[in-house]
């Protein structure tokens, strides 16, 4: 009888080696079984992973192992999203080359992931900084150029004058560069763009067909694409400004035109620039605006400011009515025409602006049934539906009808021999700017020639490799100052030319990697046959923070790759799941006001003093403040490394805990107590199986219909069916709860087996039940499952065995319980044979004591029976 404790440190490496030797997880493209592609968003090799990172990999692994057992040819690959700024920062701070830093981190993190026992196809591994990978990315780029999906144009960017680089909107904090602290400038730079707007309508329409995506993600993408139907109105200028006669404004609410009290233009609008030429104060204001972040979020949170240019426009329906034109810091040139008309009564931002600058507020929409004479707007705009007021010929109309009426009338009026207005569909989505003034990224394969212009690098000359001999001793892009790399001959005329020194946005790298995994050995970016067979990804797993950009860019890429013949599909991901985070409390000594030090969980001990938890820094004995539960992050040091758990408890404990306590879409709190509890259950499973194994090893699974053996079989098969359904729905915590239930069911029978007290029928039922238990735990605790199977006499691996099939006859209850109501109020229940007819149900209900008491000896007026559901007695 085996009674030793299960030793994960000995067991887990043994089974990982066994799986690797048999290459169980290497998918074959020619396998005739039905395909299933499960993928977790691949990691950035930042140095080390923490336990929070592994939660989504564990989720994907459970699905992969389950689907293999169900007979699918499963592709479950892993790679590295390896380009990006952190490597350059490390190069500057630590005097280490980005390539060396990146590949060292990959080696470390690969070993960390392998310790977790993930069933990954490592044969397909690649990093996006591998020359083989970015060579194919350059091939795609040139195909996109040829197809007209790439353009080069001027765009406003956040420029850090100290680091001499473009910053993403998220890297601008309070108007300063996140790293240098320098005041950020808005500059016009000529950059490369992917024409994602060519697919805007399709990207929007196709969201409807993504049935296995979270609704919130689809809504976020819908809002980002931002389709609107509106009117482009040409407002006449009261007097010409440097040859300009009109101001074009796009609006989705032309019905509110009689509520207009001002116009606002972006700081870089042509009208603003011309007005600033003769107005130094305006020029200074425009310069201030240019030091703000360019993101919509930055503009929404910033104080709304404006500057009256002195320019006036004439109202389209009243020549005697003029409105002031302001330069405003909340208007972006990239949206619409870079100009808006402000209707304060119907928009809160416009109302705040009008109140700040003393502009008129004219209510033009009020609730139906309201009093137009008394209806006023002061501090809160009215943004709901209603009826038009104070709008002359529009009064009494609904806004939709007023929209059409304004459009019809202005389309008939002319200004400069053109209609004063035209209907227009607008999108918030903008073309994707991919230029980055950085070294550690995929080089853009273009060449600048003074005679031929910008020409592509011939495919035969690819890849354009990054030079290794670069230095990071000063800010800016090392490629710009490389003595030889950027000097090249023009492929068209042969004269001296220079390479493009911008590299691609790292979002490009992650926008097609899922396709490369289908045939990473192919010379072309994809093997179309393999890509079309494997794609779309059946289950994609990753954080909600990627709901917009990464997922939208990937959807664009599959469309662009279809247009260029690399794949024959539009949508990359069939099913999408956004998992919650692993959170941990924080510890800090010194406090926020004193720039206190963050401590890692390993640096503190938790004490219980008079019922209150205290954190003590081990090294100093100083008390640390215990903070709230937060996402694990290096900056606050509240991370737990996988080794902290696997060295003591084993990988299966970590896997079990991450999936057991919370729904997978919710956050899970990592605690030492939780880890200890998961480990205790692992040991309990081992004891249950190993103590009965000596007897059960020689027993064959046997069917039983009655007695204790029948009850064991029935409970086991019902749980088997339920666990399969739970995993299919990614309800991992529910599946685990049912495994706990099965362990409880089997505790007494297995103890009887171990003690020699079980008859042959119970032994046969227990052998079958234990086999099922082993297979049920295998997706979550695969190492323990293999150890249990070996102990039971198994000679093969659980990882290559099929998922057990439940007996349909055992999962159907022979009885049904009806809630019984009297006059619509529940009084009790009736349990009766499931196949009882309505007459038998009615007879049994009327015989119940609480029903007879309610009827007081009288016959019921009616008995309503909803089969298999509910009974209502009407007295």
UniProtKB/Swiss-Prot annotation:
ATP binds at residue 634. It catalyses: tRNA(Leu) + L-leucine + ATP = L-leucyl-tRNA(Leu) + AMP + diphosphate. InterPro entries: aa-tRNA-synth_I_CS, aa-tRNA-synth_Ia, Leu-tRNA-ligase, Leu_tRNA-synth_edit, M/V/L/I-tRNA-synth_anticd-bd, Methionyl/Leucyl_tRNA_Synth, Rossmann-like_a/b/a_fold, tRNAsynth_Ia_anticodon-bd. One of its GO terms (biological process) is leucyl-tRNA aminoacylation. Pfam families: Anticodon_1, tRNA-synt_1, tRNA-synt_1_2, tRNA-synt_1g. One of its GO terms (molecular function) is leucine-tRNA ligase activity. Keywords: Aminoacyl-tRNA synthetase, ATP-binding, Cytoplasm, Ligase, Nucleotide-binding, Protein biosynthesis. One of its GO terms (cellular component) is cytosol. The keyword Ligase applies. A motif ('KMSKS' region) lies at residues 631-635. Gene3D superfamilies: 2.20.28.290, 3.10.20.590, HUPs, Isoleucyl-tRNA Synthetase, Domain 1. Coiled coil: none annotated. PANTHER family: LEUCINE--TRNA LIGASE, MITOCHONDRIAL, LEUCYL-TRNA SYNTHETASE. This is Leucine--tRNA ligase.
């Amino acid at each position: 009888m085996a009674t030793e404790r299960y030793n994960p440190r000995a067991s887990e490496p043994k089974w990982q080696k066994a799986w690797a030797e048999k290459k169980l997880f290497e998918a074959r493209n020619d396998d005739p079984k039905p395909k299933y592609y499960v993928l977790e968003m691949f990691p950035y090799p930042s140095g080390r992973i923490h336990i929070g990172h592994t939660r989504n990999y564990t989720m994907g692994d459970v699905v992969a192992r389950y689907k293999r057992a169900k007979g699918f040819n499963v592709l479950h690959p892993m790679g590295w999203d390896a380009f990006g700024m952190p490597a350059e920062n490390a190069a500057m701070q630590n005097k280490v080359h980005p390539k060396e830093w990146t590949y060292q981190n990959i080696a470390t993190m690969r070993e960390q992931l392998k310790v977790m026992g993930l069933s990954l196809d490592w044969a397909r591994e690649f990093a996006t900084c591998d020359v083989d990978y970015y060579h194919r990315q350059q091939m795609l780029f040139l195909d996109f150029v040829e197809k007209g999906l790439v353009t080069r144009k001027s765009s406003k960017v956040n420029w850090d004058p100290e680091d001499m680089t473009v910053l993403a909107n998220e890297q601008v904090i309070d108007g300063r560069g996140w790293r240098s602290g320098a005041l950020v400038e808005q500059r016009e730079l000529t950059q490369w763009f992917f024409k994602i707007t060519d697919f805007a309508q399709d990207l929007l329409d196709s969201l409807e067909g993504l049935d296995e995506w979270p609704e919130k993600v689809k809504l976020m993408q819908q809002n980002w694409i931002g389709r609107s139907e509106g009117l482009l109105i040409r407002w006449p200028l009261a007097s010409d400004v440097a040859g300009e006669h009109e101001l074009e404004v796009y609006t989705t609410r032309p019905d509110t035109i009689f509520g207009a009290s001002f116009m606002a233009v972006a700081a870089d609008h042509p009208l603003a620039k011309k007005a600033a030429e003769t107005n130094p104060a305006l020029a200074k204001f425009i310069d201030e605006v240019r030091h703000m972040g360019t993101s919509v979020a930055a503009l929404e949170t910033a104080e709304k400011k404006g500057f009256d240019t002195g320019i006036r426009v004439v109202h389209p329906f009243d020549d005697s009515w003029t409105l002031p034109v302001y330069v405003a810091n909340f208007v972006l040139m990239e949206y619409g025409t870079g100009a808006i008309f402000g209707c304060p009564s119907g928009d809160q931002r416009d109302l705040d602006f009008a109140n700040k600058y003393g502009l008129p507020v004219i209510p033009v929409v009020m609730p139906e049934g309201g009093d137009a004479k008394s209806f006023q707007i002061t501090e809160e705009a009215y943004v709901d539906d209603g009826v038009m007021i104070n709008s002359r010929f529009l009064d009494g109309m609904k806004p939709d009808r007023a929209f059409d009426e304004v459009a019809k009338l202005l389309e008939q009026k002319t200004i400069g021999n053109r209609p004063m207005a035209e209907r227009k569909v607008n999108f918030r989505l903008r073309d994707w700017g991919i230029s980055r003034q950085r070294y550690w990224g995929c080089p853009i394969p273009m060449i600048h020639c003074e005679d031929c212009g910008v020409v592509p690098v011939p495919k035969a000359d690819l890849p354009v490799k990054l030079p290794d001999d670069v230095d990071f001793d000063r800010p800016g892009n090392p490629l710009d100052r490389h003595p030889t790399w950027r000097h090249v001959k023009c492929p068209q005329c042969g004269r001296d030319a220079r390479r493009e020194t911008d590299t691609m946005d790292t979002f490009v790298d992650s926008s097609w990697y899922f396709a490369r995994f289908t045939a990473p050995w192919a010379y072309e970016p994809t093997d179309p046959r393999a890509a079309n067979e494997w794609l779309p990804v059946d289950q994609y797993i990753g954080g909600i923070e990627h709901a917009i950009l990464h997922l939208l860019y990937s959807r664009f890429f599959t469309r662009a790759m279809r247009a260029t013949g690399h794949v024959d599909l539009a949508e990359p991901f069939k099913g999408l799941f956004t998992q919650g985070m692993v959170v941990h409390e924080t510890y800090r000594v010194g406090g926020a006001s004193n720039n206190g030090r963050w401590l890692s969980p390993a640096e503190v001990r938790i004490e219980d003093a008079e019922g209150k938890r205290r954190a003590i820094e081990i090294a100093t004995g100083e008390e640390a403040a215990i903070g709230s539960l937060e996402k694990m992050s290096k900056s606050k040091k509240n991370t737990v490394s996988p080794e902290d758990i696997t060295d003591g408890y084993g990988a299966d404990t970590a896997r079990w805990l991450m999936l057991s306590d919370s729904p997978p879409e919710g956050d899970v709190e990592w605690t030492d107590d939780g880890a200890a509890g998961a480990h205790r259950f692992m040991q309990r499973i081992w004891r249950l199986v190993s103590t009965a194994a000596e007897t059960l090893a020689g027993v064959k699974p046997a069917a039983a219909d009655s007695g204790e053996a029948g009850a064991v079989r029935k409970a086991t098969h019902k749980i088997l069916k339920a666990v399969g359904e739970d995993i299919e729905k990614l309800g991992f915590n529910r599946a685990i709860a049912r495994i706990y239930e099965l362990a409880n069911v089997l505790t007494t029978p297995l103890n009887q087996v171990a003690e020699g007290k079980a008859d042959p029928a119970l032994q046969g039922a227990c052998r079958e039940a234990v086999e099922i238990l082993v297979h049920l735990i295998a997706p979550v605790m695969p190492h323990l499952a293999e150890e249990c199977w070996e102990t039971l006499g198994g000679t093969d691996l659980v990882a290559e065995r099929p998922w057990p099939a439940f007996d349909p006859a055992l999962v159907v209850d022979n009885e049904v319980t009806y809630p019984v109501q009297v006059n619509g109020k529940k009084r009790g229940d009736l349990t009766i044979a499931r196949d009882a007819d309505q007459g038998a149900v009615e007879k049994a209900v009327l015989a119940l004591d609480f029903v007879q008491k309610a009827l007081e000896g009288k016959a019921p007026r009616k008995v309503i029976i909803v089969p298999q559901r509910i009974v209502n007695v009407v007295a």
